[in-house]
Amino acid sequence: MKKPLGTIAHTRSGDKGDTANIGVIVFKPEHYPIILREVTTARVKAFFGDLVKGEVERFELPNLGAINLLLHESLGGGGTVSLRVDAQGKTFGAALLRMEIEVD
């Protein structure tokens, strides 16, 4: 059954230069394998489309039931030079919660 990622996880996001950072944390430990399967670098890059010019990296944090995503070249140069409304990447996490995933 397809559901938004936000039904099983919450996020925090921010910036480091021109890279957005998104932490995805499951509400329940049994949902961790679902985010590992469904929240892939390819799917995240496709979800954000042209907003992410560089690669997407994923780091797994099983003891926390979380993953950390780095979206390179996604902030228009970074907070001090970007003309984007969200130059610090604070809305990337909220946006990702809308991505449809397959939930067992």
Which residues make up each language-model segment?
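Metallocofactor- and cofactor-centric catalytic cores in central/energy metabolism, strongly enriched
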Residues: K2-D104
